[in-house]
Each structure stands twice: as structure tokens, then as C-alpha cells.
Amino acid sequence: MEIKPITTYTGKVVPLFNDNIDTDQIIPKVHLKRISKSGFGPFAFDEWRYLDDGSDNPDFNPNKPEYKDASILITGENFGCGSSREHAAWAIKDYGFDIIIAGSYSDIFYMNCTKNAMLPIVLDKEAREYLADAGEITIDLPNQTVSTKDKSFDFQIDETWKKKLVNGLDDIDITLQFEDAIKNYEAAKTY
């Protein structure tokens, strides 16, 4: 999968201000029947997104017309908690979200986001509420800011994850940067 670099990103936001959204709520286990990264978007938030008859739930924010085509999810605390299934990150990415802004994340879910070309940002509740009302926001990853037309918020990110996302690199790309050193090490080994 080619990873598109994230430097400056402008997108529409959708709020989903629940705390403790776990991976089973993101992608119910009944839908974990494949190992490819695509095809999970229709099942993301399945139990909230659809009514019992299979139609869209009009009360689920991402289904509302004003949030159509939103690519930035703003949510609560402890997002992605629960089991460590990478399918949860795949489902959110396949749903159409490139950026998630939460109060906190499960460590494993956070890492799974970065491995799947999504930027997980941590901001406090006041900032998230402000951004949720903005409609459209801009993320500047190199400068680590999230902005509206009239206000800006700083965020922190580990330099390793930042480098990968800014440069569109995955774990294999990072490993290949050390290919010569790996070959030299292997050549020097006496078995």
C-alpha cells in the first residue's frame, strides 16, 4: 500500500464525543473475517451507524448531511481501547477518516493508526469542542498545529511517528533505509 504523506491537511470534521469507544464498537468481531486492509469501512461503528432494519441511523453524527465527506473524526477520551485488533484502524481508514483527534488513545490503537497512514492527535476537551464547531480545520504536521480560521492549537507527536507520516513511510521503508547496515552486519556474522 502506498502511503500518502501527511504534511498540511485540511478537512471537514465530525464530532463523536463518546469516551471509551472500544475496538469492538469500532468494528464488531462478527466482521473480522478477512485479513486484507480494505473492505471494512461499511462495518465501522456498525451498531451505532445503522438501525435494526439496516438503514442509516439519522442520529449518528457521521450519517448527518452536515458531516457528509468529513475526513477528521473528533472524539472523546480513551479512543480505541479494548482488544488490540488492527482491523479497527483499517475500518476507520476505510470509512474515510485520515485524522482522529481524541483526548487519549489506547497505546496499541494509536500505533495501529500511524502504521495505517492515519494521524492520531491528542488535544484537551476544550480544544476538541472548539474544533468540532469549526466545520473545517487545518492540520500542519511539521509544525504540530491544528487550526481554524481564528485559532490554533499545538499538539505533541513522537518524532518517529511524525517522520513516517510526513514522509509517507511504512515499517518496510524504514527498514530499507538501513539495508546496507543490515547487509554489512550479516556479512560480518560468523555462523
Curated annotation (Swiss-Prot):
Disulfide bridge positions per record: none
EC number: 4.2.1.33
CDD domains xref list: IPMI_Swivel
Keywords in alphabetical order: Amino-acid biosynthesis, Branched-chain amino acid biosynthesis, Leucine biosynthesis, Lyase
Catalysed reaction, written as an equation: (2R,3S)-3-isopropylmalate = (2S)-2-isopropylmalate
Quaternary structure and partners: Heterodimer of LeuC and LeuD.
Family recorded in the similarity comment: Belongs to the LeuD family. LeuD type 1 subfamily.
Name of the protein this chain belongs to: 3-isopropylmalate dehydratase small subunit
Organism of derivation: Staphylococcus saprophyticus subsp. saprophyticus (strain ATCC 15305 / DSM 20229 / NCIMB 8711 / NCTC 7292 / S-41)
Gene: leuD
